[in-house]
Amino acid sequence: MERGCPAASSESVTSAGERTQSAVTSSTSTWVKSQASTSRKTEASEESGLGAVDAEVGAGREAFVSMSTLREDVEDVCVSSNSQHGFAVVLDDESSTFEISSSNSLPTSAGAASTVGVVAVDDSSSTDTLNGGHPDLGHPASSEHSRQGFFNEDNEDPPVVCLINDDDDDEEPEPEEDDEEELIEDEDEDAVDIVTGAISCPNTSQLALADGTIMAADGSKIFLETPVVEEAQPHPGQVVTTGSQSELTGKPKRLSDEFLLGEEDQAENLALGRCIKSEPVNPVDDNPSEGDDGATCFSLHDRLMSVRLKQMSLTANTVSNPSPAASANAAAPEEASTSNSSSTSSSALSRADIESMDLIERRDFETEQRLTGGIILRTSSMVSQNKLNLSLIKSMAGGSKAANGSGTANSDDWPSSSNGRTVSSDSKYTYKDLSTTPTSSRKYTNSRLSKSTAKLNLGSSLGASSCSQHRSGSSSTSKSMESSTSCTGAARTDVYTNTNSNDYPSLAPTTSGSSTSGGSCQQDQEENVSASVSYSSVGSQTSQESGCSRTTAINPTAACSTGSACLGDSQASTSASTSSGAGASNRCQYATTSTTKAARQVNASAQTQERFLTRSNPPAASGAGSVGANPTASVRQRRNGSSDVVHLEVVVEEGAGGGDGGVVEPGDFSAEEPWANCDEENNCSDLEEICTCQNGNGSSYGGSNASLSETFDMDAMDPDEPISLSLSSASAGFTEYSLTNPSSLMSHQRKRKFNEGRLLDGGDYSVTISSSGEVGGPGSGVSDNCRKRIAYDFASTPRSSQHLGPTAVLSVTPSSHLTSSTPGSALGRRTPRSVPSRDNPPPELQHWLAQFQRWSHVERLLALDRLIDHCDPSQVRHMMKVIEPQFQRDFISLLPRELALFVLSYLEPKDLLRAAQTCRSWRFLCDDNLLWKEKCRKAQILAEPRSDRPKRGRDGNMPPIASPWKAAYMRQHIIEMNWRSRPVRKPKVLKGHDDHVITCLQFSGNRIVSGSDDNTLKVWSAVNGKCLRTLVGHTGGVWSSQMSGNIIISGSTDRTLKVWDMDSGACVHTLQGHTSTVRCMHLHGSKVVSGSRDATLRVWDIEQGSCLHVLVGHLAAVRCVQYDGKLIVSGAYDYMVKIWHPERQECLHTLQGHTNRVYSLQFDGLHVVSGSLDTSIRVWDVETGNCKHTLMGHQSLTSGMELRQNILVSGNADSTVKVWDITTGQCLQTLSGPNKHHSAVTCLQFNSRFVVTSSDDGTVKLWDVKTGDFIRNLVALDSGGSGGVVWRIRANDTKLICAVGSRNGTEETKLMVLDFDVEGACVKCS
């Protein structure tokens, strides 16, 4: 099995194991059967066994006798050997031609690297069957198990409701026509988040619905939970409607999302005309009126809110003088409050009971540095199911109804201190002491004072209860208001009071006007009234987990605008269709309409208002106007009037679309502009900070925020400078304000803040806004999902127990399309909070991305090209900064070492060397020894210990390398470059033998042995070129020689062979027996085979100096011989090639086919290759003696051949060199062309890369063995072509030895040594 494919390996192992197991089983059964049969045949076997043995022995003897003689000879001489004999050269005395034979061998190369197979793994372990179905919202949960979502049919676990942490805010479901969402399989590790059941969630397929609910396979529902506030989940039996796909887009978490989760669901269902059926919790009325269907719709928000308040809710059985049991019921969970809802009373909690509750809670606050708790105000749609059904709401509503005649409300009914706290603070909230805040710009920080934050949820039910009358009777200051009918109803709707003892004991809210007895207030369109909302806010807290301050608010009182209708608490069952009405009808802007647009939350800090409360008295709110008119009121800003009232206008932006009824979800970026984070660098310090959270579908400009944030930079404006507030009528009956400051508008468009120091100087600011215009029509109502938050944060607020009355007035008026504002209006400008960012993208971005996803690949590329063309350099630079890190991941370092090495093994060695220069980690991996060993194996590089390796470190020129195989490869690479392209160093010239011919040449290690016709042999050092020894003893010319280690054997015309000791130069043995010139020899181990002109071959033992065998059979002089230790192959002038068995002294095969003298041989144990004067080269089979191939192509005598791994290179007297494949008989390359030799090729050498050839033209050429291309000339004699000849060459990986001379005396006889090794290579020399 190939490595790198674990899947395939495991499968193969498994298959092999199965086959082995089956084989063992089969063999076992066979053995059992054979035992039974053997027991029955025992006696018969004993009788006939001896005869069978004799018969088998006889048959074996006959087979042995009948073996062929050739087979016996082969088996007798079956000892393989690799020839390392020297180059023997014999001058043919008869023909005067040189016979060239080469036997120098290079290491064999291994086969090609095995490829890595990749086997795909089929994961068939899953057995779940996914069945998709469209949910039927009209059926209960019991029927959803078989029709809704994806489920596993094999799962029999009981249904369970799991709570999953909703952290994947950035995921966007694919837009599809169906309501099916992608499967969500998320296991929540928080055990306390499991609401229903104690069993874990079954591992089944789940369907995510659009309202944040996941429908499991068994019919159970999984409700997502945000990480901010823990929420209670509805009953599993409830049916939850689904929304559109686009409404599920994630957005930044904020507190308003947590508190309005139920409102969002309810608004969605109201838009779809559906009703969420749930168990009624704390109904406001004992006998609520029936709706259209006779079924009361309730919101899930009641349950969700109770969990956030640690399940501390107000019970419905409070009386005017509550008992301690009633107090205990006030702290009971919501589930218990459902049973007590029938005993509600119209009186509020007594102060004594509230004080007793405060004593318990004060201990918690004192341990938290006397910080106040959160006060949560929930005002949802006036439809009854969206109300917080708490007893305090009804009791306060009843109290305010009783006071309609007098038009005043008692301030004692409005507790603002710890005595009036009715609920405990949520322990999950994070409280922060202002004295310890990291901002250093707080100038009036007081450690005694606590920071309180008020959260005002200005939903469409802000005026659900009838408008309460202002305590100061501000309505009497306006004549037009006296003639009009305003709204006064049950104030303090949906109130949760949670204050600190340092707050004011009473803050009474009042609103001008009187209410009708029916709980709703209507008036003619011609009458004009000024609407204002007074907020007495206390108890703020700052959330650490968001950039904006988390706030809660209390005591809202609303005054409806002209021509509006306010729905009271008694209209609990008023349906959405009833409240929508006709488009031309006038109704309150806070009434619930069928066009469920996003509602807004306005969060006001109590400390900010307390700062205003200490400096102001109730003013007279005046306003005049008529329907369709655009009046303009001039308002002056004063600092020295202690009786001035600060009127803060908050224009609640309507959702765009002209009342089309589109449902806007908080997660839909296309329908709203998300809120930005508070910037520390933008002076978010102890100065007042306004956090505006928009939810509009119209323009990207925060127009409704601009009226408060941008227009009034109150600390920098002149006290006497007038502020012009122009009121213009907009389309669809909406009212829009254009607030301009002609002299200082542009200079005040900066961070929204109120300088606390200026406020303490005694100056308050009065802003009176006169509003008029038709309110109503399609989409005129402020819906449930809009939210707007305003936070006023002050560090030091003087605490006082005196009654200060209402001081700050917030006028909330719906606004129309911001695009219709005038160019100079501040409403058309974007506030700093709406600047787009990564977490706050523009609304159109989501649509653009959705369209981009629908395009094909080519269309996307085109869109990107166009996008880049329209980008300026700064934007292109931003793209580069984002894209570049994606391509800079160090995947090699991240992988395990084994996998990283496996990846690197596919790189070429030169690429590995470059990769090693990347970093330390990559160098460590790229230097792996086994990795480079494989590279060396493929390149046929042997890393044996060599004495001529170059030095490393200080003395050498190569850096030290940890991996020996890498060092060997790098050294070989440098050597190859020296051969191929680098300048040839000046050769060493070894002069000797005078003017005689060098007839034989041997080279091994650092020693060179040359034989000449001057009867001598010389031993040279290949390192320094010195002549080490001169071997004298022959009486005739030396025409053949062999060399092995320290032994030199020479053959001469004196018919003897001599064995020499290289170190001492002494002749060890003289081998006599031949009767003519010893023309050729081949040494293998301790035996040497010699061929002579006497037509015989002799086998000698060089250690004993004796003749072992004499082989007789040739008819003419033996010209060439090869010996591998087992068989001897000889070629002679009788045109024949013989294969001998030396031990038996017999000829196994006579290879006949040549038609002329045989001059050269090559033998590798399997094949015999013979070159003849007949220009042919024949390939013979050793076993059969048959001729396998006849290689034709040369035109003359084949003077020399080299054979390595089925590759044969032959040099011919026709000046060409050919490369053959002896297995196929094809000519692979012909080394010729314009750079070919100009005369006969005398000798050649080759390895796996190069072919080196010498010629009578006096040149030595280098060729590429694979391509046959000419590389360059290594040697070019000056006398070349005029008599200079290169007779013999020998080469290894680093050196080339050339025997040079001439026939006419034009070139001196010498040896040239060319070194291609790495510079600095040091070899041991003697």
From Swiss-Prot:
Residue numbers bearing the Phosphoserine modification: S825
Chain residue ranges for the region called Disordered: 1-58, 123-187, 318-351, 399-549, 615-642, 797-843
Localization: Nucleus
Residue intervals of the F-box domain: 889-935
GO molecular function: cyclin binding; ubiquitin-specific protease binding
Regions of compositional bias (Polar residues) in chain numbering: 9-39, 403-464, 495-504, 632-642, 797-824
GO cellular component terms listed in the entry, alphabetical order: nucleus; SCF ubiquitin ligase complex
Main location: nucleus
Protein's GO biological process: branch fusion, open tracheal system; cellular response to hypoxia; DNA endoreduplication; negative regulation of cellular response to hypoxia; negative regulation of glial cell proliferation; negative regulation of growth; negative regulation of imaginal disc growth; protein ubiquitination
Modified residues (Phosphothreonine): T813
Impact reported for A1117V: In ago-4; increased cell proliferation
InterPro entries: F-box-like_dom_sf (IPR036047), F-box_dom (IPR001810), G-protein_beta_WD-40_rep (IPR020472), WD40/YVTN_repeat-like_dom_sf (IPR015943), WD40_repeat_CS (IPR019775), WD40_repeat_dom_sf (IPR036322), WD40_rpt (IPR001680)
Compositional bias (Acidic residues): 165-187
Database matches in PANTHER family: F-BOX_WD REPEAT-CONTAINING PROTEIN 7, PHOSPHOLIPASE A-2-ACTIVATING PROTEIN
Subunit-level organization: Part of a SCF E3 ubiquitin-protein ligase complex. Interacts with Myc and puf. Interacts with CycE.
UniProt function note: Substrate recognition component of a SCF (SKP1-CUL1-F-box protein) E3 ubiquitin-protein ligase complex which mediates the ubiquitination and subsequent proteasomal degradation of target proteins. Probably recognizes and binds to phosphorylated target proteins. In the wing and eye, negatively regulates cell growth and proliferation by mediating the degradation of Myc and cyclin E, respectively. Required for endocycles, but not mitosis in follicle cell epithelium.
Annotated protein name in UniProt: F-box/WD repeat-containing protein 7
Annotated organism of origin: Drosophila melanogaster (Fruit fly)
Lineage: Eukaryota, Metazoa, Ecdysozoa, Arthropoda, Hexapoda
